[in-house]
Amino acid sequence: MAAAAASHLNLDALREVLECPICMESFTEEQLRPKLLHCGHTICRQCLEKLLASSINGVRCPFCSKITRITSLTQLTDNLTVLKIIDTAGLSEAVGLLMCRSCGRRLPRQFCRSCGLVLCEPCREADHQPPGHCTLPVKEAAEERRRDFGEKLTRLRELMGELQRRKAALEGVSKDLQARYKAVLQEYGHEERRVQDELARSRKFFTGSLAEVEKSNSQVVEEQSYLLNIAEVQAVSRCDYFLAKIKQADVALLEETADEEEPELTASLPRELTLQDVELLKVGHVGPLQIGQAVKKPRTVNVEDSWAMEATASAASTSVTFREMDMSPEEVVASPRASPAKQRGPEAASNIQQCLFLKKMGAKGSTPGMFNLPVSLYVTSQGEVLVADRGNYRIQVFTRKGFLKEIRRSPSGIDSFVLSFLGADLPNLTPLSVAMNCQGLIGVTDSYDNSLKVYTLDGHCVACHRSQLSKPWGITALPSGQFVVTDVEGGKLWCFTVDRGSGVVKYSCLCSAVRPKFVTCDAEGTVYFTQGLGLNLENRQNEHHLEGGFSIGSVGPDGQLGRQISHFFSENEDFRCIAGMCVDARGDLIVADSSRKEILHFPKGGGYSVLIREGLTCPVGIALTPKGQLLVLDCWDHCIKIYSYHLRRYSTP
């Protein structure tokens, strides 16, 4: 296990292991003691104290944003591996594992295929001579093994492509089934509504018949009630008559005749009533009512059919061209969404530079001047604007007069002919970053094949470089005409010298860094780059091109590290997701944080201020025009927002 670890050991890897990724200071056994979070990342104790002081329920890891719920640093364990590497004796032992497996004193140059050992030249000549042993240089053996792995990787990628096609076909089948389910359910609903209409008509007829019976019976009952009331009145009248007789004198009562007949009051009342009785006679269904039944029948679907693939349609919008505006300060009107920067914290400048909103250029679409998820922005010294339009697979070039042209991948050669003949899709240009040097060459990092491509302004590709690049991302142009490219997975910054006729003529490693991504440079050739992976917490579509860094480093043209801006650039402020940078004429650094949705300003002399804090959705690129206007590329708004930027002196803390 130690030998396997030592095979990948180098000075850059040791520096990455022995430095805190936040403050970029080397770990020590005291104040900068390495502490291990629950997610597995290592941070020094000093940075953890700041993280713990600025949170309530724990520490949020700047790498993966997972929360380690602790109340004290004593609850975290030390990274014993890092502490062991700090020991000089242990480090010497690890370096010794990189030597010849036979003598252990010299660097290996040969590889014995028979024994599986890396050997130095004297050991090979002494003990590993043919025919008993087959030896070859280490580089050739490694390249041979890489080719074997590459063939296996190619087969696996073909298999992955086939699996993706089958998954897409299966998704199409699933959507078709869902549509069929919905259609059958709608048909059932129509039939159910028809039955409900029939039931409503039946209920109306039934209630009408019941109302007729109720009316007839009511008439009989009312007539009988009328006769009873008359008889009751007659009875009351007779009662009053007899009461009066009872009160008469004896002589008068006896003198009246007593043979008066008593009237029959109930003679007119009927003895029987003829009414209509009702009852419910059930007709039709004997069992429960059923509208219909779902009938199943077998259906065979070929998952390799092309009909199962989901087709996408893009809506075209009106074209909007970019035109740089010439406006006086009196004509500038601030947008209600873009307010001047306010002071934030005790470290903010007292006289803060104001950036007023001027205009928004472009919208979502595929026509010239429109954008679809733009990810990179670059402005040349002549005022030309280059935009990496990732969603439309192109680079758009604008001049001060408006849209100039677009650059796409123009396939040529026998491979493209074969792909076209077979009906396969041609490779696209998937730009991640773009820049133009002083020679008029346009450098683009392409995520389609993880390469650096260099184009002329006419769209002709003069170079395509993949060697030494694992995942190229950011690119910038030095004043000398060289391109600097960041390799996120390789952890290096590469410097390329490109010739218009010969392509890439020279390349070298400028420096190493922790997952460098976005890059820019000033007029003196100092390169600024982001480090680490800060996740945008509002990345709703899981788009990895919207993830940025959480600290900034710099390196000179000679490879010497310079100014560093750590994760905590202020006492109470930190980076969340750096997605773009640029440098103004004074050497001040301007940073776009897509998670904070703000544009930050870091003067060369120190301090910071917030230039723009409102009106941005997801800023991913910024650049300054020669006329002093600040261009902000808003990815989720699919446009360029233009602000005023005045170069004036002000004091910083």
UniProtKB/Swiss-Prot annotation:
A Gene Ontology molecular function term of the record: translation initiation factor binding
CC terms in the record's Gene Ontology section: autophagosome; centrosome; cytoplasm; cytosol; endoplasmic reticulum; mitochondrion; nucleus; striated muscle myosin thick filament
This protein's name: E3 ubiquitin-protein ligase TRIM32
EC number: 2.3.2.27
Function of the protein: E3 ubiquitin ligase that plays a role in various biological processes including neural stem cell differentiation, innate immunity, inflammatory resonse and autophagy. Plays a role in virus-triggered induction of IFN-beta and TNF-alpha by mediating the ubiquitination of STING1. Mechanistically, targets STING1 for 'Lys-63'-linked ubiquitination which promotes the interaction of STING1 with TBK1. Regulates bacterial clearance and promotes autophagy in Mycobacterium tuberculosis-infected macrophages.
Residues that bear Phosphoserine: S55, S328, S335, S339
Lineage: Eukaryota, Metazoa, Chordata, Craniata, Vertebrata
UniProt cross-references to Pfam families, sorted A to Z: NHL, zf-RING_UBOX
Tissue localization of expression: Spleen, thymus, prostate, testis, ovary, intestine, colon and skeletal muscle.
PTM remark: Ubiquitinated. Phosphorylation at Ser-55 by CHEK2 under oxidative stress, activates the E3 ligase activity and promotes ATG7 ubiquitination leading to positive regulation of the autophagosme assembly.
Pathway(s) it belongs to: Protein modification; protein ubiquitination
NHL repeat spans: 358-401, 415-458, 459-499, 562-605, 606-646
Gene Ontology biological-process entries: actin ubiquitination; autophagosome assembly; axon development; cellular response to amino acid starvation; cellular response to stress; fat cell differentiation; free ubiquitin chain polymerization; innate immune response
Zinc fingers (RING-type) by residue: 20-65
Residues recorded as bearing N-acetylalanine in the entry: A2
Residues in B box-type zinc fingers: 103-133
Residue runs in coiled coils: 138-197
SMART domains from the UniProt entry: BBOX, RING
Organism of this sequence: Homo sapiens (Human)
Residues that hold Zn(2+) according to the record: C100, C103, C123, H128
Catalyzed reactions: S-ubiquitinyl-[E2 ubiquitin-conjugating enzyme]-L-cysteine + [acceptor protein]-L-lysine = [E2 ubiquitin-conjugating enzyme]-L-cysteine + N(6)-ubiquitinyl-[acceptor protein]-L-lysine
InterPro entries: 6-blade_b-propeller_TolB-like, NHL_repeat, TRIM32_Bbox1_Znf, Znf-RING_euk, Znf_B-box, Znf_RING, Znf_RING/FYVE/PHD, Znf_RING_CS
Involvement in disease: Muscular dystrophy, limb-girdle, autosomal recessive 8: An autosomal recessive degenerative myopathy characterized by pelvic girdle, shoulder girdle and quadriceps muscle weakness. Clinical phenotype and severity are highly variable. Disease progression is slow and most patients remain ambulatory into the sixth decade of life. Bardet-Biedl syndrome 11: A syndrome characterized by usually severe pigmentary retinopathy, early-onset obesity, polydactyly, hypogenitalism, renal malformation and intellectual disability. Secondary features include diabetes mellitus, hypertension and congenital heart disease. Bardet-Biedl syndrome inheritance is autosomal recessive, but three mutated alleles (two at one locus, and a third at a second locus) may be required for clinical manifestation of some forms of the disease.
Assembly: It self-associates. Interacts with DTNBP1. Interacts with PIAS4/PIASY upon treatment with UVB and TNF-alpha. Interacts with AMBRA1; promoting activation of ULK1 through unanchored 'Lys-63'-linked polyubiquitin chains. Interacts with TICAM1 and TAX1BP1; these interactions target TICAM1 to TAX1BP1-mediated selective autophagic degradation.
